[in-house]
Structure formats: C-alpha cells, structure tokens
Design a protein with these regions (language model features):
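Conserved flavin/dinucleotide-binding core of flavoenzymes
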Residues: 9, 44, 50-218
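Glycine-rich loop(s) and the adjacent beta-strand/alpha-helix scaffold that form part
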Residues: 1-62
C-alpha cells in the first residue's frame, strides 16, 4: 500500500513500535500516558423489587470491591422496551477500577491492570454475590435466587489517561507528553484520545480533525 500521508489513530503506547524511527523524546512522551483499567459487569436479575423497596436506583460504595451498582439506564429502541415494572427482569451495571492506593496514578494503573488480568471469573462472581447481598438484602434480595446471569467485561487498557495535579508536573502546554507525542513526523500524523490526554468521543473527533489538517498542503 502507498499513500501520500498516514494518520496513526491507535493507542499512544503502540505508536513507537509501529514507527520506531520517531525521535526518542517523542517515543518517551507516547509511553507516558498509562490507560486506566476498568471492569464493567452486567448482572441479570429476576426482578428489581429490592431496589423499589429500598427507594434506590444507584449505590456508590467507596472502598468496596465494586465502586458502583445501578439499574441499567432505560433504553427504548425499535420494538425493544426497557423494563418498567419492578416485577420484570433487568440488568444491573457494576463498575470497578482496580488500583493500589498510595502510589502515583500511573503506577496504580499498572498494578490494577495486572490484578485485572489475573483475577478469575470465580472471584468476580463471589464479589458480586457478596456485595449485592450486603447492599440489597434489606429489600428482600437473595443472590442465590435472584441472580440469573453474569457477564464480566475486563478492559485492562480502559480509559485514556487524564493528567492529575496530585501526581503529574504542571507542564507548560507545549511540553505536555500528549502534545509532544502528537507532533507530525514526516507524512505521519497522530490522532486518538490519548493525543488530548482524555478518553471521550469529542476529543477523538477534535484530534482527528487536527491530524488530517496537518497532512493537507498549505
């Protein structure tokens, strides 16, 4: 394949391997941003009467294994309709970002990733059943009776890294690793959320627009 230009729109940490000719300072900058490990879990339950009895929709649990438990947000598409009666089955959404408190954020993410990759499904299931029982039992929830299915989605390289003033230097704008890392190299430009040091769609669109324009003449 031949082209007049190329946009590398992948994870920052992969780019030095795809283009080893980059300057060392740029490769170092591309390796700086460490993605946040995440676990998003869906739990199918027979009904959500326990939530109704307790008068809750979401529970935040700082310090617990799962940091948040909530009823899935209602989505109506085509002929599909979200459950409206507490007697109907529904999905719960559980989230976790494994970390190691006390360390710099980037090191916490690395340790959290290792934990995530070495955790068995049996451990996730046990933690789910235990926390849901402690959270919802006062509303009549019984994990042995009410849990129908569990799906664990592990993202070892989850959200893009965002600078944290507790751990990262207060760089001038042009010296931030994401800015150094996205510099054009010949006919190669770089676009991804890492280039904006964030994790969201609007940033990806903005960075794609910038990278394409860097390739255009004039």
């Amino acid at each position: 394949m031949r082209a007049k230009g190329c946009v590398l729109a992948c994870w920052n940490m992969m780019i030095p391997y795809l283009c080893p000719e980059l300057p060392e300072a740029q490769k170092e900058a591309l390796h700086y941003l460490v993605k946040v490990p995440l676990v998003y879990t869906s739990v199918g339950i027979r009904n959500w009467t326990s939530f109704q009895k307790l008068g809750i929709q979401r529970v935040s649990s700082p310090g617990s294994y799962w940091s948040a438990v909530s009823l899935n947000s209602p989505v109506n598409m085509g002929e599909y309709r979200s459950p409206t009666s507490p007697e109907e089955p529904i999905l719960l959404h559980l989230s976790r970002s494994p970390c190691k408190p006390g360390l710099p954020a980037r090191e916490q993410h690395k340790i959290g990733r290792y934990e995530l990759l070495t955790t068995t499904f049996e451990t996730f299931e046990r933690k789910i059943r235990d926390q849901l029982a402690r959270t919802l039992s006062a509303g009549g929830f019984d994990p042995a009776r009410d849990i129908e299915a569990i799906t664990v989605n592990r993202w070892p390289h989850g959200y893009g890294y965002e600078y944290n003033p507790l751990f990262d230097p207060d760089w001038p704008e042009d010296q931030r690793p994401n800015v150094i890392g996205r510099k054009p190299f010949g006919k190669i430009t770089i676009a991804n959320t890492d280039s904006a040091a964030t994790a969201y769609t609007d940033a990806a669109i903005d960075q794609a627009y910038r990278a394409v324009n860097e390739l255009l003449p004039g």
